């Protein structure tokens, strides 16, 4: 006959195997206690109960072992984490980044080299009288250039030689580098009227005030002086005693100048001839008469 089909609505057979051992023992001994009081039956019941108890104790031991193993793994993970933190010196969580940066700046400031003292005095064991730089106050130009450009530091080497340079490798006290000087972007501006008043007060008190009458007199005198100078230049030019500059000469002889066209040269000696004749006549007229 084919096996009977499992009734609908009943649980999974596999779940029955997962029942409590005590319940399984009770199911196995159901009816045996009341069926017969023989020794064999009682022994069978005790054996079933012992097996159920042993099965229950195995499950309990397995659970206890699993719990202990998990606790050991947790403790091992915590110990490994603490070892890594101690190895890499991690920053404590209570220390804020701001405090860390402040400490970093303090360390950097303590390692900064002093520009106003010669570090060679700390790096040498020579007596004072044998140090080449001890008898001068002149600052080394290479040292000053390195300070201005920001290249001076603990590893900087002087082109003259650190221990052989005869000049100071230290700035005078109170000296301010050009790169540290604050540029004044705000320039003081004054008005034209204020500038005129300032310049007028600088002239002093012993001056003639400018009036309309004084200005007219000065203007007329200046015009007369210019006309007189022009007349003198014309008279001197007529007698050949011209002291004209190059510019004045060309401006007064524009009609006598010429241009060279192509490769041909056109020389006009008429002007030169007239000037030579005028000069000769002037010399003859001014020559003293000698009696024979």
Swiss-Prot record:
Does this entry carry the keyword Lipid metabolism? no
Gene Ontology MF, one? zinc ion binding
Where are the annotated segments for Disordered? 1-76
Q: Which Pfam families match?
A: DFRP_C
Q: Mind telling me which GO cellular component terms the entry cites? A: cytoplasm; cytosol
Q: Which residues form a coiled coil?
A: none
Please state the residue ranges covered by C3H1-type zinc fingers. Answer: 134-172
Concerning PANTHER family, the annotation shows:
ZINC FINGER CCCH DOMAIN-CONTAINING PROTEIN 15, ZINC FINGER-CONTAINING PROTEIN P48ZNF
The protein, known as: mRNA export protein 33
Instruction: Write the lineage as a comma-separated list.
Output: Eukaryota, Fungi, Dikarya, Ascomycota, Taphrinomycotina
């Amino acid at each position: 006959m084919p096996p009977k089909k499992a009734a609908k609505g009943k649980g999974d057979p596999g779940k029955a195997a997962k029942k409590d051992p005590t319940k399984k023992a009770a199911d196995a001994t159901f009816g045996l206690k009341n069926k017969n009081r023989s020794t064999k039956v009682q022994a069978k019941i005790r054996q079933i109960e012992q097996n159920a108890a042993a099965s229950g104790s195995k499950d309990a031991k397995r659970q206890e072992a699993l719990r202990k193993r998990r606790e050991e793994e947790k403790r091992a993970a915590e110990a490994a984490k603490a070892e890594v933190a101690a190895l890499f010196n991690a920053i404590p969580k209570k220390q804020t980044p701001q405090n860390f940066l402040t400490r970093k700046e303090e360390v950097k400031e303590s390692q900064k080299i002093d520009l106003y003292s010669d570090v060679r005095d700390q790096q040498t064991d020579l007596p004072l009288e044998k140090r080449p730089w001890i008898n001068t106050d002149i600052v080394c130009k290479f040292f000053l250039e390195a300070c201005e450009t920001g290249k001076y530091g603990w590893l900087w080497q002087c082109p003259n030689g650190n221990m052989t340079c005869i000049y100071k490798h230290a700035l005078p006290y109170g000296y301010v580098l050009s790169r540290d000087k604050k540029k004044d972007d705000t320039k003081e501006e004054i008005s034209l009227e204020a500038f005129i008043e300032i310049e007028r007060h600088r002239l002093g008190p012993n001056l003639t005030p400018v009036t309309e009458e004084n200005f007219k007199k000065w203007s007329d005198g200046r015009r007369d002086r210019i006309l007189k100078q022009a007349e003198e230049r014309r008279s001197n030019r007529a007698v050949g005693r011209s002291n004209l500059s190059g510019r004045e000469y060309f401006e007064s002889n524009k009609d006598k100048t010429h241009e060279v066209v192509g490769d041909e040269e056109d020389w006009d000696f008429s002007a030169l001839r007239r000037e030579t004749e005028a000069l000769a006549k002037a010399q003859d007229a001014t020559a003293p008469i000698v009696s024979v």
